[in-house]
Amino acid sequence: MIWLTLVFASLLSVAGQLCQKQATCFAAVNKRRKHIVLWLGLALACLGLAMVLWLLVLQNVPVGIAYPMLSLNFVWVTLAAVKLWHEPVSLRHWCGVAFIIGGIVILGSTV
């Protein structure tokens, strides 16, 4: 169950980062304060909840194991950047993502 909490904390953290990115997109396009405040508010809510979940994880998992698992954030953000904003990702970047996933699998299998 704690591993699901860790994954959910990671996803919420990423959602917060994506909301921040979306706020900057609105700022560049039409400078509507209402939209910027909405996206930044969502970012704060996601990041705040992620922090609470992260504290629960740290109560149950050694920090030396838990913290590297947050590398999942790089994977989620890369996938979202490609899907949502059609950002280009180089082969080198994808190789890095593969190494991150491999590292997470190795660390996760030792627990």
Curated annotation (Swiss-Prot):
Source taxon at top rank: Bacteria
Cellular compartments annotated: Cell inner membrane
GO biological process, one term: lipid A biosynthetic process
Sequence ranges on the Periplasmic membrane side: 57-60, 109-111
Cytoplasmic face of the membrane: 1-35, 82-87
InterPro entries on file: EamA_dom, Flippase_ArnE, Small_drug/metabolite_transptr
Membrane topology note: Multi-pass membrane protein
Keyword Transferase carried by entry: no
Any matching Pfam family: EamA
Segments crossing the lipid bilayer: 36-56, 61-81, 88-108
Gene Ontology CC: plasma membrane
NCBIfam families in the cross-refs: PRK15051.1
Family indicated by similarity: Belongs to the ArnE family.
Designated name of the protein: Probable 4-amino-4-deoxy-L-arabinose-phosphoundecaprenol flippase subunit ArnE
Organism, as annotated: Escherichia coli O45:K1 (strain S88 / ExPEC)
Gene: arnE
